[in-house]
């Protein structure tokens, strides 16, 4: 697939429910192909899954159904009529002209928020088998070049850069960055408090040790 430009409607920001729907459809297409496309009930369960999701959500079927209709209006999902139940499939790879490795990365970022290269490499194993982190990094750079992904500023205490999708609104991005900056400050403060407590404990032990040595040194030898 090429990196040609997509239609403007595709790049209009998604809301949080639409982001979750697309991420779930991408994930389940790769991990449970026998049950894909998904019924509405299966998609609701996937959206509310307690593992591999950030943030956790508790969506009603009506909310998911409305999100599907909005995405269908932008040709990003398609209804597949079935004899027992109607099912839904995504068309994000076609709409954005994504290769399989790019689709897997975007799906992970939609589902789990900002992640490091190592986190993406570990978590992508079920979706796409990257040879190594270098290959994954190359695909991230291509997505960055198309403004589908961005590299986040490193927060205090973080050793690796994190990457985030850019399919949500600018307000969502700012809110997430603010929340993560606050959490980083809290973590740093907590770590600082623990260090101060340890230093105080060490100083106390050193004082007690010095006194013990002094007492032993002043004692008279036994004959």
From Swiss-Prot:
Protein's name in the database: UPF0502 protein Avin_04790
PANTHER family per UniProt: UPF0502 PROTEIN YCEH (PTHR38768:SF1)
Protein family membership: Belongs to the UPF0502 family.
Disulfide-linked positions: none
InterPro entries: DUF480, WH-like_DNA-bd_sf, WH_DNA-bd_sf
Natural source organism: Azotobacter vinelandii (strain DJ / ATCC BAA-1303)
Pfam families associated with the record: DUF480 (PF04337)
The organism's place on the tree of life at top rank: Bacteria
């Amino acid at each position: 697939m090429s990196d040609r430009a997509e239609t403007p409607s595709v790049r209009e920001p998604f809301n949080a429910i639409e982001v979750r729907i697309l991420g779930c459809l991408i994930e389940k297409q790769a991990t449970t192909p026998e049950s894909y496309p998904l019924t509405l009930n299966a998609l609701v369960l996937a959206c509310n899954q307690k593992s591999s999701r950030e943030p956790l959500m508790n969506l009603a079927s009506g909310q998911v159904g409305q999100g599907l209709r909005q995405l269908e209006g932008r040709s990003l999902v398609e209804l597949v009529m079935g004899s027992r139940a109607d099912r839904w499939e995504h068309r994000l790879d076609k709409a954005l002209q994504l290769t399989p490795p790019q689709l897997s990365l975007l799906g992970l970022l939609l589902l789990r928020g900002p992640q490091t290269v190592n986190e993406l490499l570990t978590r992508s194993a079920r979706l796409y088998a990257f040879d190594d982190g270098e290959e994954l990094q190359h695909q991230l750079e291509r997505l960055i070049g198309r403004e589908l992904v961005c590299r986040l500023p490193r927060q205090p205490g973080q050793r690796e850069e994190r990457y985030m999708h850019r399919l949500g609104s600018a307000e969502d991005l700012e809110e997430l960055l603010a929340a993560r900056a606050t959490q980083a400050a809290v973590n740093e403060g907590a770590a600082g408090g623990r260090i101060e407590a340890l230093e105080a404990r060490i100083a106390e032990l050193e004082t007690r040790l010095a006194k013990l040595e002094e007492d032993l040194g002043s004692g008279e030898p036994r004959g």
